[in-house]
Design a protein with these regions (language model features):
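Short, exposed beta-strand-loop hairpins at the edges of beta-sheets
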Residues: 109-115
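Surface-exposed binding patches on compact interaction domains or structured appendages
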Residues: 59-85
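Long, low-complexity ectodomains and other extracytoplasmic segments of secretory-pathway proteins
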Residues: 20-46, 53, 115-139
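Short, surface-exposed loop/turn segments at beta-strand-coil junctions that are enriched for proline
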Residues: 96-101, 112
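Bacterial Sec-dependent N-terminal signal peptides
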Residues: 1-23
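Short strand-edge motifs at loop-to-beta-strand transitions and within beta-strands
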Residues: 37, 87-93
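Asparagine-centered strand-capping/turn motif at beta-strand->loop junctions
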Residues: 54-58
Length: 139
């Protein structure tokens, strides 16, 4: 009976240990040179672009599976090829600047083999262009 109890205990313990696999975080795989970019004041209707540069700090190639944004006004583009160990890659982020207002948008980066997404941020303020302001005043 003791042997059965010990065997069952050992089995439960080993399953519990195996279930606690170490989760890899994005910061363990890549290092971004910046995680936030402020465009400052930009003219309405003038799209702006920023490249978030990152370095693969792991010993395996990194694949960016997906890049998405918090709204349709922000368009991220991911590298199509794997980024080798020690190499750098870029995430292109374009903001359309259609609406006059301050903005704070998030870009979500999904890396292969990493459960949690990396979140990048862009901020700024879209101001009315002088042409739009003049047209409104003349009406």
């Amino acid at each position: 009976m003791k042997k059965i109890f010990l065997f069952a205990s050992a089995l439960v313990f080993s399953v519990a240990v195996m279930a606690q696999t170490q989760q890899v975080k994005a910061d363990d795989v890549v290092k971004f040179s910046a995680e936030k970019h402020d465009f400052g004041k930009i003219k309405q209707g003038t799209p702006v672009t920023y490249y978030f540069e990152f370095k693969n700090i792991s010993d395996k190639p990194v694949v960016v599976e997906n890049a998405s944004a918090s709204c349709g006004c922000t368009i991220p583009e991911k590298p199509e090829k794997p980024i080798g160990p020690g190499e750098t890659g870029k995430i292109k982020v374009q903001y359309n600047a259609a609406a006059v207002a301050p903005f704070n948008k998030d870009v979500y980066i999904k890396l292969a083999g990493v459960e949690q997404q990396k979140v990048l941020h862009i901020t700024g303020e879209v101001v009315a262009s002088t042409e739009n302001s003049a047209a409104k005043k003349s009406n």
